[in-house]
Amino acid sequence: MNSLERIFTTIYDKDLWNMGQSESKSGLGSSGDFTKHIQLTLLDIIHRYRIKNMIDTSCGDLFWMKTILPFLECDYLGLDIVKSVIDANKEGTKNIENNHVIEFKHTPFLEYLRSLPSQSVDLLLCRHTCEHLPTEYVIEFMKEAKRVSNYLLLTTHKHAIANRDVELTETPYRPINLNLPPYSDLLDAYQIESLYDGPQSHIRSEMYINLYRFHSNLI
């Protein structure tokens, strides 16, 4: 077990992201109120851009994703670095009916993406993930995303006035603004949409998810 896996396994085992709520062990951003918009956004993007397959880089406990899995018009692969999470997801989705493939894999997502052929993934979803990872790791992920995927959905925090690094402590976190260096240098030219991804009950104007197109899968 590497250092990243140890940290995030501890977070899940100790329920450190639950913050006193009872809905999702993946944290407040995975709760029902915080995911109403992303559920509709994801289904819409899959339909509009004719997505045939997608990878969820850090699927977590599927609290909100499980709601829309039956309606996905594409194959779905959920990755997570925490083995117990993947084991639970495999068991918990056995009875979901969908004509498309639904699979899960225990792996660090950067390592997995490096094993894939170029342009082999229509859509990468990386929601509420990079905020918890060192800048160097995030940049390497972005480079791989540009190589393997046609589209990327990635969380951004518009209120952040500068990007800083994060140490791998017990609960690593800092907001990331994708439209500022060093990330803007890699991604700005490819951005095609920026969509609200905050709670439904009250608007959090800084919480968005950006859509990037690196290659077109449309004929």
Question: Which sequence ranges carry the predicted segments?
Answer:
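Hydrophobic adenine-recognition pocket in adenosine-nucleotide-binding enzymes
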Residues: 129
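Class I (Rossmann-like) S-adenosyl-L-methionine-dependent methyltransferase catalytic domain
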Residues: 1-53, 58-117, 133-219
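A conserved beta-strand element that flanks and buttresses the S-adenosyl-L-methionine
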Residues: 125
